[in-house]
Amino acid sequence: KEVYRHLLERGERMYSESIGEKRMRIAALLEELEAALQQEQPQHIREVFRRVKSALDEWEADAVSFFS
């Protein structure tokens, strides 16, 4: 689905802009989402999608508040 592709692209962008532990955590989340998509189990995909989206949202919010 397109929503999953957009989340992967967003995560890849954040990965390329990050360093250290945050970068490693983003990589692990993206790998988990890609694995879920390959398994093609809708319930599992939705759970992983929510977890990845929540983490990326939180990190972006932290970055925005840091620069505000």
Residues covered by each model-derived region:
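PAZ/PAZ-like end-binding module
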Residues: 1-68
